[in-house]
């Protein structure tokens, strides 16, 4: 029983320590990466290129899970899309 509690505690701790980022990928202009007219699987491939665990087309932009912290994702607060 103590072993099971220790195992579960370790799993929870690992989940807290190894945090991964998720969000919308950005293009070179700071806009969400569009998938509106892209083929099936496009977003999954783009997320994999950025070392993400998975991704999908959250119409009309690519959304990724499990991204490393160095990948920039679109955020409403820092949105620079279409601004100069």
UniProtKB/Swiss-Prot annotation:
It comes from the Eukaryota. The keyword Ribosomal protein does not apply. InterPro entries: LCN-type_CS_alpha_beta_dom, Scorpion_toxin-like, Scorpion_toxin-like_sf, Scorpion_toxinL, Scorpion_toxinL/defensin. Residues 1-20 form the signal peptide. Disulfide bonds join 31-81, 35-57, 43-62, 47-64. One of its GO terms (cellular component) is extracellular region. This is Beta-mammal Tt1g.
